[in-house]
């Protein structure tokens, strides 16, 4: 197995993996948008023949006035390749790139409240926390958990150097700002 940064020529295989694994599907232009806007953030897992068996599609949220943070748009691993640590490795590579390239303080994602396997991965392996429940988030009306993983602490524990060390360490986190307003 090999984990590497996704390239434009991987996008069809990523979309195929998405169609096989998930009920939420995207048009090809959405994959291109991610690949061209944030080329460092999406990763694939490939088997020994070079076939894509999993991917993470990620982006940076660019809300003015908010601290830099990433978002996982989609994560999928084909069924026969699950429980091998591929999702964990791809998510860690994406998190590293978010910190090293964009000074991301945290990463967010949404997950179906019924997706127990994904919740277990996010909460227990990747240390995401549920921060909110968004009613009827999905097209079929199912609710989503909004989840978040602190990247500042994660990066510090792994000696990962942010894009701009001074800005990274002097910027207050959203939680610090909320505490100061209280």
UniProtKB/Swiss-Prot annotation:
Its EC number is 2.3.1.255. The keyword Transferase applies. One of its GO terms (molecular function) is protein N-terminal-serine acetyltransferase activity. GO terms for biological process: dauer exit; dauer larval development; determination of adult lifespan; multicellular organismal reproductive process; nematode larval development. It catalyses: N-terminal glycyl-[protein] + acetyl-CoA = N-terminal N(alpha)-acetylglycyl-[protein] + CoA + H(+); N-terminal L-alanyl-[protein] + acetyl-CoA = N-terminal N(alpha)-acetyl-L-alanyl-[protein] + CoA + H(+); N-terminal L-seryl-[protein] + acetyl-CoA = N-terminal N(alpha)-acetyl-L-seryl-[protein] + CoA + H(+); N-terminal L-valyl-[protein] + acetyl-CoA = N-terminal N(alpha)-acetyl-L-valyl-[protein] + CoA + H(+). Residues 162-182 are annotated as: Disordered. Residues 1-152 form the N-acetyltransferase domain. Keywords: Acyltransferase, Transferase. Expressed in head and tail hypodermal cells, hypodermal seam cells, pharynx, intestine and head and tail neurons. InterPro entries: Acyl_CoA_acyltransferase, Ard1-like, GNAT_dom. GO terms for cellular component: NatA complex. The keyword Acyltransferase applies. Disruption phenotype: The majority of animals die within five days following dauer-like arrest, but surviving animals grow to the L4 larval developmental stage or adulthood. Animals display a dauer-like phenotype in response to pheromone and starvation, form dauer alae and have a constricted pharynx. Unlike dauer defective animals, these animals are not temperature sensitive and do not complete dauer morphogenesis. Animals have an increased propensity to accumulate fat. RNAi-mediated knock-down also induces a dauer-like phenotype and fat accumulation. However, knock-down does not influence the lifespan of animals. Component of the N-terminal acetyltransferase A (NatA) complex. Belongs to the acetyltransferase family. ARD1 subfamily. Catalytic subunit of the N-terminal acetyltransferase A (NatA) complex which displays alpha (N-terminal) acetyltransferase activity. Plays a role in regulating larval development, metabolism and longevity. Functions downstream or alongside daf-3, daf-12 and daf-16 in the dauer formation pathway. Functions upstream of daf-15 to enable animal development. This is N-alpha-acetyltransferase daf-31. It comes from Caenorhabditis elegans.
């Amino acid at each position: 197995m090999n984990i590497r940064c996704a390239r434009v020529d991987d996008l069809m295989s990523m979309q195929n993996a998405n169609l096989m694994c998930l009920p939420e599907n995207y048009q090809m232009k959405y994959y291109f948008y991610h690949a061209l806007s944030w080329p460092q953030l999406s990763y694939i897992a490939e088997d020994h023949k070079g076939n894509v068996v999993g991917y993470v599609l990620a982006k940076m949220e660019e809300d003015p006035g908010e601290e830099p943070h990433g978002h996982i748009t989609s994560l999928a691993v084909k069924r026969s390749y699950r429980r091998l640590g591929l999702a964990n490795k791809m998510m860690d590579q994406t998190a590293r790139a978010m910190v090293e390239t964009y000074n991301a303080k945290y990463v967010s994602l949404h997950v179906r409240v019924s997706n127990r396997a994904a919740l277990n991965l996010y909460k227990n392996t990747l240390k995401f926390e549920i921060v909110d429940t968004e009613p009827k988030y999905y097209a079929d009306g199912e609710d989503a958990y909004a989840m978040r993983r602190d990247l500042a602490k994660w990066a510090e524990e792994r000696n990962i150097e942010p894009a701009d060390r001074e800005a990274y360490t002097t910027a207050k986190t959203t939680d610090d700002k909320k505490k100061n307003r209280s």
